[in-house]
From Swiss-Prot:
Its EC number is 6.1.1.17. This is Glutamate--tRNA ligase. The gene is gltX. ATP binds at K243. Zn(2+) binds at C96, C98, C123, H125. InterPro entries: aa-tRNA-synth_I_cd-bd, aa-tRNA-synth_I_codon-bd_sub2, aa-tRNA-synth_I_CS, aa_tRNA-synth_I_cd-bd_sf, Glu-tRNA-ligase_bac/mito, Glu/Gln-tRNA-synth, Glu/Gln-tRNA-synth_Ib_cat-dom, GluQ/Sye. GO terms for molecular function: ATP binding; glutamate-tRNA ligase activity; tRNA binding; zinc ion binding. Monomer. A motif ('KMSKS' region) lies at residues 240-244. It comes from Hydrogenobaculum sp. (strain Y04AAS1). Its main location: cytoplasm.
């Protein structure tokens, strides 16, 4: 049975690259009717926080990614200690008492010579008695894995094919820190083995970790899982996606009014393309049905804010059920304008749904329905050219209407045009300035026909 895992570290908000990794791991498990495991990798005591863990969990739920099993590495330290001891007892690991300042000095010397640092194995051959004496005296230590000399580690990557790496360059690497906490490459192996993970899908930055992990699997007698290393995501300038490219976290898009279905859709097609899909708008169910790891492109994917913005607009305009759209919009609008009547909002959404691509954009574009706005500079300039009597005429005409509709507003404008020398454009501009404070935005006949009549008259009164 297929078992995949997503193993984020709670050291920051979830990056879009991590989210895509989680989505691909999720799709692979669901496509094969397997199990999807969420594991929080919080062994970095200094940088891991509960706030970021909660954020990751919340963002995954928001994206619609549900897991079957949940683990937290900080609750498994006793297990890691047990397996570290097994490696020591079997001769695959050893205590290292080298001082950190000496290691740092060696590292600096290697860098100065243009070489990568490799631990020289100083403590590799200490006698059992020497080790016991130093442990009894309370001397600080780390535990290092003993890397076999002259070995080539090979594995078949599900995306890249065969990868072979000479492990001689690694040196004996640390698996347990001096504070007793275990290192990523060690705990990832223990957890993946004990959780019976069959397929590990992760970013290509982990390729160099894989040989180290395979050595640990072999030393403990575990069968390694299959590995798939995803290509990196680039910004539109073809450099690795980072904060300088703008929003790069799931949290950013959530807070800026994107809907989860659109972000899920965009990320799952970022580097994955299938002839079976053949379209840019795809549901989670379709993604599960058609997902094949072999269809992942080996070349880096380019993240486009514009493409995601467009796709989100498609979801808002055409795909989201009205009740979901209302619910999502309501939360954004009430943050900006206070309590919003749901029936009033239904009228607004019915008439304006095609006018915005994000909820945050909707907050600004729908402002005239909830709050008066001060005139912008263009509106001020236009107002200076308008005969102020038009506002009084508009007020009189609208007062006489039983209700305001787009059709009878045309009649209002026509009546004013007949009784004055004003052009229709001037009358419409006057109405727009009074109601919205701007010459741009949603059609003014739509705004005027949805706003309560008394509110329309009140705003006109400011200019009479």
């Amino acid at each position: 049975m297929v078992r995949t895992r997503f193993a984020p570290s709670p050291t920051g908000y979830m990056h879009l690259g991590n989210a895509r990794t989680g989505i691909f791991s999720y799709l692979f498990a669901r496509h094969h009717n397997g199990t999807f495991v969420l594991r929080i990798e919080d062994t970095d005591r200094e940088r891991s926080t509960k706030e970021f863990e909660d954020s990751i969990i919340e963002d995954l739920k928001w994206l619609g990614i549900e897991w079957d099993e949940f683990y937290r590495q900080s609750e498994r330290f006793d297990i890691y200690k047990e397996y570290a001891k097994k490696l020591i007892d079997s001769g695959h690991a050893y205590y290292c008492f080298c001082k950190e300042e000496d290691i740092e000095k060696q590292r600096e010397e290697a860098y100065a010579q243009g070489k990568a640092y490799r631990y020289p194995g100083t403590c590799r051959h200490l006698s059992k008695e020497d080790v016991e004496d130093r442990l009894k005296s309370g001397e600080s230590y780390v535990i290092r894995f003993k890397v076999p000399d002259g070995q080539i580690v090979s594995f078949e990557d599900m995306i890249r094919g065969n990868i072979s790496i000479n492990v001689d360059d690694f040196g004996d690497f640390v698996i347990v820190r001096s504070d007793g906490s275990s290192v990523y490459n060690f705990v990832a192996v223990i957890d993946d083995a004990l959780m019976k993970i069959t397929h590990v899908i992760r970013g290509e930055d982990h390729i160099s970790n894989t040989p180290k992990q395979i050595l640990i699997y072999e030393a403990l007698g575990f069968k390694p899982p299959e590995f798939a290393h995803l290509p990196v995501i680039l910004g539109e300038d073809r450099t690795k996606l980072s904060k300088r490219h703008g929003g790069v976290s799931v949290r950013f898009y959530k807070e800026n009014g994107y809907c989860p279905e659109a972000l899920f859709n965009y990320l799952c097609l970022l580097g994955w393309s299938s002839e079976k899909v053949g379209k840019e708008v795809i549901s989670k169910e379709e993604a599960v049905k058609y997902f094949d790891i072999k269809d992942i492109n080996l070349s880096p994917a380019v993240f486009s804010h514009d493409k995601l913005y467009w796709l989100n607009g498609v979801y808002i305009r055409e795909i989201l059920p009205e009740d979901r759209l209302l619910e999502d919009l309501l939360s954004f609008l009430e943050k900006a304008y206070g309590t919003v009547d749901i029936e009033y909002l239904k009228k607004i959404v019915k008439a304006t749904r095609k006018e915005y691509n994000t909820y945050l954009e909707a907050v600004e574009k729908l402002r005239p329905f909830f709050k008066e706005k001060e005139l912008d500079e263009v509106a001020k300039e236009e107002l200076s050219k308008i005969d102020r009597k038009v506002f009084e005429l508009l007020k009189q005409e609208i007062e006489s209407l039983e209700e305001i509709t787009p059709e009878n507003l045309k009649g209002v404008v026509k009546n004013i045009q007949k009784s004055t020398s004003l052009k229709p454009k001037d009358v419409w501009h006057a109405l727009r300035i009074a109601l919205t404070g701007s010459l741009e935005g949603i059609a003014i006949d739509v705004i005027a026909s949805i706003l309560p009549k008394e509110e329309v008259l009140k705003r006109l009164s400011r200019y009479t």
